[in-house]
């Protein structure tokens, strides 16, 4: 058994950058049978973060799963990041996780102690979330992969969908972008220690705390920023909600080092497919540096929440977020009536 191989060198892509591109997904999902059930609150149609099924007037189940390849070489840290990413979908729907189950793909050439550390990292994040880890499933694979299937709960009338953004709302982003670029640098072993530590801190932080800061405020819609990049998820929110969204490019928080690395051309392949998928739906209203534009399409791993909130509650939201440990949050846009383009970047 080889204990010295770097986990990130055993995979083609790292983290959420390993997802199939949005164009491919659209092709394979387009002719699946449509599900009609009066209790299905959120299903496939709006490309949301999780499914929501009404059990009774006071409770709905949230169901989601997520897994990916290593973004770091330390197995415990990888487990933490993968679990935080999986749990995020429940918070993005306005709910709380109840139970979690491990999803594991693991090469037989690696020491089982490595898998033990991955699972410990995941278990500690599940414990932090307040959910229960109740089982899982493993298969042998050439590339290591790890994540969770999560069941959560939410009140049926308090679901945060990605398709219900309200005209006049403002958008808050609760974590910086640029994680795909940093993960590419980490995989290539060119990230500095400061860049590595910064990326790990952002990716391993649960979105639980941002959710709790906002859960009692007037939120109309929410999604988490992952593999389709910041603008990709903004587009999904605009399209699903029948609105246009204006993004303040200079207000989008960037993780330290991301702009410099992007300027050097350290860009994950997923950025290009993300941009190709929606570039005809995005209008740049002014010149933007190439590196900044790339970062707006950069596939994120365990990114932040993008929250549509009323102007009335915006001050309370910002104050509440300022009271929690945060990696950086910002007002990044506003919701407009539907116009010629889904997304306007200024």
UniProtKB/Swiss-Prot annotation:
GO BP terms: namely:
selenocysteine biosynthetic process
GO MF term set:
ATP binding; magnesium ion binding; selenide, water dikinase activity
Q: Name one GO cellular component term.
A: cytoplasm
EC number(s) given by UniProt: 2.7.9.3
Task: Give the transmembrane ranges.
Answer: none
Which class of enzymes does this protein belong to? transferase
User: How are cofactors bound according to the entry's free-text note?
Assistant: Binds 1 Mg(2+) ion per monomer.
Reaction(s) catalyzed by this protein? hydrogenselenide + ATP + H2O = selenophosphate + AMP + phosphate + 2 H(+)
Where along this sequence does the record place binding of ATP?
19, 46-48, 66, 89, 136-138
Q: Which positions are annotated as binding Mg(2+)?
A: 49, 89, 224
List the active-site residues. Answer: 16
On the tree of life, the source organism's domain of life is Bacteria
Record's keyword annotation contains Cell wall biogenesis/degradation: no
What does the UniProt keyword field contain?
ATP-binding, Kinase, Magnesium, Metal-binding, Nucleotide-binding, Selenium, Selenocysteine, Transferase
User: What cofactor requirement does the entry state?
Assistant: Mg(2+)
**Site location (Important for catalytic activity):** 19
Give the matching NCBIfam families: PRK00943.1, selD
What protein family does this chain belong to?
Belongs to the selenophosphate synthase 1 family. Class I subfamily.
Q: Which HAMAP family match?
A: SelD
Function, as annotated, reads: Synthesizes selenophosphate from selenide and ATP.
User: How the protein assembles, per its UniProt entry?
Assistant: Homodimer.
This protein is called what? Selenide, water dikinase
- Name of the gene encoding the protein in the UniProt record: selD
